[in-house]
Amino acid sequence: MASSATAPNSLSFFSSSLFLSSSHQIPKTYISVSKLGSGRVSKPLSVSSQLATLPILSFEGEKVGETYLDLKAAPEDTARAVVHRAIVTDLNNKRRGTASTLTRGEVRGGGIKPYSQKKTGHARRGSQRTPLRPGGGVVFGPRPKDWSIKINRKEKKLAISTALSSAASAEGGAIVVEEFGEKFEKPKTKDFLAAMQRWGLDPKEKAMFLMIDVDENVAKSSRNIGTLRMLTPRTLNLFDILNADKLVLTPAAVEFLNARYGVDAVEEEDDDEDETEGSEEA
């Protein structure tokens, strides 16, 4: 008997479950369909994060305006896994994997029998290279190994944008400061610490600055502060984002983040290629 039920108008996703709904109930979400005609729809790869409004401070520490960050973020049920995989990949790819030890067959010398087999009162011994003797070989010691892990560029970008979105959405997690490169006529750490205090930053807390171009005097004034990281889009990485207590951005850096990691960002053609280098530009 043929069913009289009509086809649903649309599909929507709620709490990782598939429900039928009308066209006016479709939430704004970004989904990826693996194969057309396969009848299977994959889970959302990324969704728009909550719009984060950030205050803009002048060099003197006064609020002069507001700006926003609207970045892609992984769904709540997969965000932790996406960020964890990306940070493990970065840390593993930084390992040299050159640790090496010598086995008893590689240790130099010790070919002669140390003493007679009998009449010494000692245990019989055939070589000085045995792992039981000082200077002998090592049993199951470390050997050179490639620790690198591959990760898709889209996945790495999603992890970075998720971390940035989380930091920006947290109360007091991020601020925007007007360009201050010309304010430092000469390198002086004392002046930079005073500026940080005007911006509400504690020098004892970890802070990450993201600037498009770092002035030479700014770089020299801040390099003696152990809790501070001064980054550019070329050196932006997930570890420093997660390790920082507060993010400090410039207006140009905000525009860069919205353009590269925002909801309307255009994906690159080679985003599906794998990455193994942890120091590549994110």
UniProtKB/Swiss-Prot annotation:
GO terms for molecular function: mRNA binding; poly(U) RNA binding; rRNA binding; structural constituent of ribosome. Keywords: Chloroplast, Plastid, Ribonucleoprotein, Ribosomal protein, RNA-binding, rRNA-binding, Transit peptide. It comes from the Eukaryota. GO terms for biological process: translation. The keyword Metal-binding does not apply. Its main location: plastid. GO terms for cellular component: chloroplast; chloroplast stroma; chloroplast thylakoid membrane; cytosolic ribosome; extracellular region; nucleus; plastid large ribosomal subunit; plastid ribosome. Residues 1-49 form a transit peptide. Pfam families: Ribosomal_L4 (PF00573). Disulfide bonds: none annotated. SUPFAM superfamilies: Ribosomal protein L4 (SSF52166). Gene3D superfamilies: 3.40.1370.10. It is found in: Plastid, Chloroplast. Residues 106-138 are annotated as: Disordered. The keyword Ribosomal protein applies. Belongs to the universal ribosomal protein uL4 family. Part of the 50S ribosomal subunit. This protein binds directly and specifically to 23S rRNA. May play a role in plastid transcriptional regulation. NCBIfam families: rplD_bact. This is Large ribosomal subunit protein uL4c.
